[in-house]
């Protein structure tokens, strides 16, 4: 199923670029990163087709299904900057919509700012005579009042998808499951016509794709013909449709074959072939595009899982009034003091219940609800959390305040009927194949969700890639440079995401962590950010490359280490000087005591 909906009253502004961009781009996966990339290409004059294996995510069924498995997203500086690098559909960068809002503003309007963490610590267990007691500890994210923004993934995706559909250069194809891709189709076709063998290319490049599981989300739009408006020869046989090229063309460089869901009750699916000049792989951690590239080039690739899974839960609103209800308390959705009757918990906090090997988190939504995620080892889901009695016992002991808000019956139903989802990370290198394909988003660097940087990093991919593309005439030179410059940053954020899981589950209540946090806050209040900034602030509230963030943090740790050693040496030296200078007082007493002990 394809969809094209254009705003005919809005003229499409083309952004300036030095690069000779491809005529037709295929974006595989219609998720947030894919939609943003599609808009960026479309605004530079490219015809874009977005291909998505799943149905339209804007339907009620799709929204309900996504709410059961998707972790809320935390949008911060890198993601906001990435959104602002791509203008609204039909408008140039730096040009606001009539109401003065840009794409980032539209997304932020549908988010809830979180200025701090709220740590929930059980200080007294429940007993027969008294209720459990939970202490809440607020930890500000920034000394400058900066916030991260909780946004529903489906809502964000639909905003970007709507704006992609508004652009006249974009077409979206839903329920198109990629089956095979030939990145060198034009080379092979030309060699076949000339009667000469094509250059040596691994013949297995496409075979692996048959029946592959595609989980991606971004794709790019095309003319209704799917072939750039050129003449085509179409043949149909046994439910398959093949659009044959009418001669060698720049848009014939890459061939993509899809299985397409059919509404015909006699034919469950049909086959469809599309051609493109360039492919953007935004098809998630199990990327088919990445696997196809890996069979053609020497790609370094790892996919690691951790022994922790997650299940989504929900805290409903206090009332049905939603985010527009009467202000109360100390936490409003506008980031200022004041709250709303709809929220059971402070709305401007990311709530964490750290319990070492497992934890619960809750992020606010505009309607007053909280999206909760329980992270725990798989063996815990299979044992303590597999029965009603076990679930209630775990929550009464570790999350008594959350249990009262979630509702015991709904909690038990969620944990006994839903399967825990896996968590893992992907690392690969390079991110491109010649000037024909590139990987961005989770397809290039899926990461653990504990730093809240997955989406932000994906949006930053788009910004960084086009910053480089716009400065170079050759697309291949630009992509070579993108891989070279981006790889150290992506390795760094993958490591930071793994480290932050340990911090959230263990360290947030430890005295070394709290001491370092206070020291960072003190130094940041008296020194400029160029001289001192916390690791979290550099990662979340700046666009500093991730690799430089890690180097800066190591330097700051070294400074603190040297300062502690110097302080210890100074203390010992001062004590030694004090002892020596007062020897006239303690030396006679010491001599007499030793003499008495000796005589006895």
Swiss-Prot record:
Name the needed cofactors.
Answer: FAD
Q: Which GO terms describe its molecular function?
A: FAD binding; kynurenine 3-monooxygenase activity
CC annotations in GO = mitochondrial outer membrane
Name the pathway: Cofactor biosynthesis; NAD(+) biosynthesis; quinolinate from L-kynurenine: step 1/3
Record's subcellular location: Mitochondrion outer membrane
Entry keywords, A to Z: FAD, Flavoprotein, Membrane, Mitochondrion, Mitochondrion outer membrane, Monooxygenase, NADP, Oxidoreductase, Pyridine nucleotide biosynthesis
Q: Does the keyword NADP apply?
A: yes
As recorded in UniProt, its EC number(s) are 1.14.13.9
- Annotated region described as Disordered, given as residue ranges: 217-242
Q: Which GO terms describe its biological process?
A: 'de novo' NAD biosynthetic process from L-tryptophan; anthranilate metabolic process; kynurenine metabolic process; L-tryptophan catabolic process; quinolinate biosynthetic process
According to UniProt, the reaction catalysed is:
L-kynurenine + NADPH + O2 + H(+) = 3-hydroxy-L-kynurenine + NADP(+) + H2O
Pfam families, from UniProt?
FAD_binding_3, Pyr_redox_2
* Record InterPro entries: FAD-bd, FAD/NAD-bd_sf, FAD/NAD-binding_dom, Kynurenine_monooxygenase
UniProt KW Transferase keyword: no
Q: What does this protein do?
A: Catalyzes the hydroxylation of L-kynurenine (L-Kyn) to form 3-hydroxy-L-kynurenine (L-3OHKyn). Required for synthesis of quinolinic acid.
Family to which this protein belongs: Belongs to the aromatic-ring hydroxylase family. KMO subfamily.
- Report what the protein is called: Kynurenine 3-monooxygenase
Q: Which organism is it from?
A: Mycosarcoma maydis (Corn smut fungus)
């Amino acid at each position: 199923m394809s969809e094209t909906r254009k705003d005919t009253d809005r003229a499409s502004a083309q952004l300036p670029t030095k690069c000779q961009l491809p005529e037709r781009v295929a974006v595989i996966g219609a998720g947030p990163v894919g939609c943003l990339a599609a808009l960026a290409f479309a605004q530079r004059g490219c015809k874009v087709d977005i291909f998505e294996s799943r149905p339209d995510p804007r339907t009620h069924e799709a929204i309900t299904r996504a709410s059961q498995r998707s972790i809320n997203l935390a949008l911060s500086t890198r993601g906001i900057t990435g959104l602002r690098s791509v203008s609204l559909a039909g408008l140039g960068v730096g040009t606001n919509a009539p109401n003065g809002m840009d794409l980032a503003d539209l997304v932020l309007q549908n988010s809830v700012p979180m200025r701090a963490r709220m740590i929930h610590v059980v200080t007294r267990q429940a007993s027969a005579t008294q209720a459990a007691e939970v202490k809440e500890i607020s930890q500000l994210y920034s000394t400058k009042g900066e916030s991260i923004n909780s946004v529903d993934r489906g809502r964000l995706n639909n905003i970007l998808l709507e704006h992609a559909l508004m652009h006249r250069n974009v077409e979206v194809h839903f329920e198109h499951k990629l089956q095979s891709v030939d990145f060198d189709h034009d080379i092979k076709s030309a060699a076949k016509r000339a009667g000469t063998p094509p250059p040596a290319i691994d013949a297995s490049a496409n075979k692996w794709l048959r029946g592959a599981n595609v989980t991606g989300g971004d794709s790019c739009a095309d003319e209704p013909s799917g072939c750039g408006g050129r003449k085509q020869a179409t043949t149909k046989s046994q439910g398959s449709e093949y659009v044959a090229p009418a001669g060698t063309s720049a848009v014939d460089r890459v061939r993509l074959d899809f299985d397409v869901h059919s509404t015909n009750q006699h034919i469950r699916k049909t086959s469809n072939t599309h051609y493109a000049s360039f492919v953007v792989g935004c098809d998630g951690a199990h990327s088919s595009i990445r696997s196809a590239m890996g069979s053609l080039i020497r790609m370094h690739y790892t996919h690691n899982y951790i022994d922790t899974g997650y299940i989504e839960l929900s805290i409903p609103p206090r009332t049905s009034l939603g985010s527009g209800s009467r202000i109360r308390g100390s936490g409003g959705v506008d980031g200022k003091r004041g709250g709303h009757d709809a929220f059971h918990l402070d709305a401007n906090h990311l709530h964490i219940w750290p319990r070492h090997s497992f934890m619960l988190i809750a992020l606010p939504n505009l309607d007053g609800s909280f999206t909760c995620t329980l992270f725990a080892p798989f063996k815990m889901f299979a044992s303590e959390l597999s029965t009603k009695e076990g679930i209630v016992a775990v929550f009464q002991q570790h999350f008594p305040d959350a249990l009262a808000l979630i509702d015991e019956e709904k909690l038990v139903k969620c944990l006994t009927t839903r399967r825990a989802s896996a968590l893992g990370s992907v690392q690969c290198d390079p991110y491109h194949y010649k000037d024909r394909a590139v990987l961005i988003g989770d397809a290039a660097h899926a990461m653990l969700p504990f730093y809240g940087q997955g989406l932000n990093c994906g949006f930053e991919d788009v910004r960084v890639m086009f910053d480089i593309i716009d400065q170079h005439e050759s697309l291949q030179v630009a992509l070579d440079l993108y891989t070279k410059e981006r790889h150290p940053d992506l390795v760094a954020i993958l490591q930071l995401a793994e480290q932050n899981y340990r911090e959230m589950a263990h360290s947030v209540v430890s005295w070394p962590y709290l001491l370092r946090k206070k020291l960072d806050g003190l130094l940041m209040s008296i020194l400029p950010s160029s001289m001192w900034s916390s690791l979290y602030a550099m990662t979340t509230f700046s666009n500093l490359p991730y690799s430089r963030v890690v180097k800066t943090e190591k330097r700051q740790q070294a400074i603190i280490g040297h300062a502690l050693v110097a302080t210890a040496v100074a203390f010992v030296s001062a004590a030694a000087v004090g002892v020596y200078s007062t020897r006239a007082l303690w030396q006679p007493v010491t001599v007499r005591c030793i003499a008495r002990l000796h005589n006895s």
